[in-house]
């Protein structure tokens, strides 16, 4: 079996990636936020130039799939894409309510300053997947489990304290609103100058640290980050509402409606959307099958990539299979259905990993997609084997 092709870059708006159903164009909203007008425009672009769906990524980006090469220039004309390739900043989506003005919240202010610095002519040239995290709220870290190479995050010394921390280091140095962005750029420049970027143009901070690199004294410290927040689930949170979608995919018209209902929306790295909502809107969401508003929905227990035929590297269809498996996955567990060994939808281990191969699905417990594909004990699966393999004897729940 030929191994999957590992790309060192993500399909940004100006540099799309070809897939089985056309180009994949990734949009990085500034501060992971969209006004109602911006969301409606993006939805219209997805309907006009793509397949009519918007896919949410685990980097709080939005993918438009099915774009024809000949219409890609028209899509770019509809987007403000000139600087998005250099803006890879993940922002805490939950607004803290002890700040009077959301626009003056330190998450927004610091992310804006960081984006401006990255757009400067003298900014360091970073690998395509290299990213920043801005995670400041209430002495907690909403993004503690989300990937980021350079992190500006709440400290454990007090709810107003922030630290700058290189991913892979257990502690960081205290920073302020005024100094954080500049020091983050200095850390990025140190990463490049100290050999963090390989000959192939790739590089991640955690790997650099694991190889023995250490930030200089001015970019390191002994302050620990704040404790992680409770893992996010669909439903009310922080004065707003988190809404999920099966496999992180939402129809364009529903995306636009959600933004209009909330006034604006935050794209999260949890493949959910966060927005302000009243009781009437939440009630409408509950009765619309396009939205997932309950944390008990079985579809939240499965993760699946695009699969075949949308992805040329996938050996088989994935999402219909994931819908079949969802009712049998035990509560509290996660099943990862991957079209190939790359495991794009869920890079880490899952309680149940099922990976498509030319011979069929192969599975392993507490494994990555690659481990499931390669494990000696992996077994060929079809939908009729799932109940036994998952060791879940209760009647399936309605998905």
Model-derived segments and spans:
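Residues that cap or delimit alpha-helices
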Residues: 68, 210-214, 382
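Short Fe-S-cluster ligation motifs
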Residues: 336-349, 363-396
């Amino acid at each position: 079996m030929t191994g999957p092709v590992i790309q060192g870059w993500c399909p940004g708006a100006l540099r799309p990636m070809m897939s089985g159903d056309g180009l994949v164009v990734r949009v990085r909203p500034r501060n992971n936020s969209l006004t109602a007008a911006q969301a409606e425009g993006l939805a219209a672009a997805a309907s006009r130039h793509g397949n009519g769906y918007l896919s949410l990524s685990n980097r709080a980006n939005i993918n438009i799939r099915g774009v024809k090469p000949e219409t890609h220039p028209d899509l770019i004309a509809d987007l403000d894409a000139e600087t998005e390739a250099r803006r890879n900043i993940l922002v805490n989506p939950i607004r803290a309510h002890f700040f009077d003005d959301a626009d003056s919240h330190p998450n927004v202010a610091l992310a804006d300053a960081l984006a401006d610095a990255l757009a400067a002519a003298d900014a360091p040239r970073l690998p395509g997947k290299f990213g920043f995290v801005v995670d400041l709220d209430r002495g907690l870290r909403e993004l503690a489990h989300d990937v980021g190479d350079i992190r500006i995050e709440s400290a454990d010394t007090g709810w107003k304290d922030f630290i700058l921390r290189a991913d892979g280091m257990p502690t960081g140095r205290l920073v302020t609103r005024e100094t954080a962005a500049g020091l983050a750029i200095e850390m990025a420049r140190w990463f490049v100058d100290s050999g963090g970027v390989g000959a192939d143009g790739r590089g991640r901070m955690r790997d650099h640290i694991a190889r023995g690199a250490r930030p200089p004294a001015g970019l390191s410290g002994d302050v620990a980050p704040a404790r992680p927040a409770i893992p996010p689930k669909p439903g009310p949170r922080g004065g707003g509402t988190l809404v999920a979608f099966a496999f992180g995919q939402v129809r364009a018209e529903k995306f636009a409606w959600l933004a209009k209902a909330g006034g604006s929306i935050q794209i999260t790295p949890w493949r959910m959307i966060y927005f302000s909502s009243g009781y009437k809107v939440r009630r409408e969401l509950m009765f619309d099958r396009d939205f997932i508003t309950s944390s008990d929905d079985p579809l939240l227990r499965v993760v699946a990539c695009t699969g075949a035929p949308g992805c040329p590297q996938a050996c088989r269809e994935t999402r219909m299979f994931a819908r079949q498996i969802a009712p049998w996955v035990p509560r509290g567990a996660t099943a990862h259905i991957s079209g190939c060994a790359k495991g794009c939808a869920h890079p880490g281990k899952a309680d149940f990993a099922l990976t498509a191969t030319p011979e069929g699905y192969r599975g392993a417990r507490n494994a990555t997609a690659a481990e499931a594909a390669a494990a000696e004990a992996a077994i060929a699966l079809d939908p009729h084997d799932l109940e036994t393999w998952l060791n879940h004897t209760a009647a399936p729940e309605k998905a």
